[in-house]
Amino acid sequence: MLPARYRMTRSTEFSTTVSKGVRSAQPDLVLHMANVLDDPSGPRVGLVVAKSVGNAVVRHRVSRRLRHSVHPMLDELQPGHRLVIRALPGAASATSARLHQELSAALRRARPRVEASA
């Protein structure tokens, strides 16, 4: 489970991160990452798992796998970093290891671009 202080809950946080952040696409997910300098409360993560991924059981399984994958990465993030992870339909059939690998690759690609734009 992702601790509450790391969770994105407001729609404004999601929309700001998606619109102003950098995007890094992988086959089964898309990562949007932004750096919010005026809020040093810690890195925050939001998940978007649409109905196109599958029924409620499948969507919840994908969400759990993504939360589990992002949890160890929180220590590597700066306090102002905001992440929105959008699962694509292929995430339903992807293994946990594959989702973790894709998330790591997306984060590796996005982080230098976010830090350069800050």
Curated annotation (Swiss-Prot):
Organism in which the protein naturally occurs: Mycobacterium sp. (strain KMS)
Alphabetically ordered keywords of this record: Endonuclease, Hydrolase, Nuclease, RNA-binding, tRNA processing
The keyword RNA-binding belongs to this UniProt entry's keyword annotation: yes
EC main group: hydrolase
Catalytic activity, EC: 3.1.26.5
Pfam family for this entry, one: Ribonuclease_P
GO CC term (a single one): ribonuclease P complex
Membership in a protein family: Belongs to the RnpA family.
Oligomer status and interactors: Consists of a catalytic RNA component (M1 or rnpB) and a protein subunit.
Record field: catalytic activity: Endonucleolytic cleavage of RNA, removing 5'-extranucleotides from tRNA precursor
GO biological process, one term: tRNA 5'-leader removal
Parts of the chain that traverse the membrane: none
Sample GO molecular function, one term: 3'-tRNA processing endoribonuclease activity
HAMAP family, per database record: RNase_P
InterPro entries xref list: Ribosomal_Su5_D2-typ_SF, Ribsml_uS5_D2-typ_fold_subgr, RNase_P
Protein name: Ribonuclease P protein component
Protein role: RNaseP catalyzes the removal of the 5'-leader sequence from pre-tRNA to produce the mature 5'-terminus. It can also cleave other RNA substrates such as 4.5S RNA. The protein component plays an auxiliary but essential role in vivo by binding to the 5'-leader sequence and broadening the substrate specificity of the ribozyme.
